[in-house]
Amino acid sequence: MSIKGVPTDAARPMADLIVAGEHTVASRGLARQQVADLTLFAFAAGESVSEERYPADTVYVCLEGTLAVTRGGEQALVPAGSCLRVREGVGHAVSGVGGSAVKFLQVNA
């Protein structure tokens, strides 16, 4: 698997690798292979993604802010530095908590 967009010269905070403009959702693919997809996301305050389903397990790693993952009407909070797995095929939506901006890494494998 080839990973791109991650510094090799010096360590940097992962959250600094992506920025969302006002009223936007930004994404940056780091790797896309048959075995796994790694994508950085930055949601501006108040932005969200409605329910989606993936054919593989999804791991969310929150980098800044608090990510809300809603599955079957139940919301799980993922604060910065924490992670949560959603099993394959389970519909879920993601957003920042309380209308705040959030940055996270999404891993599908």
Roles of regions detected by a PLM:
Residues 1-35:
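A short, N-terminal "cap"/entry segment at the start of jelly-roll beta-barrel domains
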Residues 23-24, 37-54, 88:
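Conserved short histidine dyad/triad with adjacent acidic residue
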Residues 66-68, 75, 91, 101:
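Structural motif
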Residues 73-89:
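Short acidic-glycine-tyrosine-enriched beta hairpin
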Residues 42-44, 53-69:
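Short, conserved beta-strand element in jelly-roll/cupin
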Residues 88-109:
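Ligand-binding loop in jelly-roll beta-barrel domains
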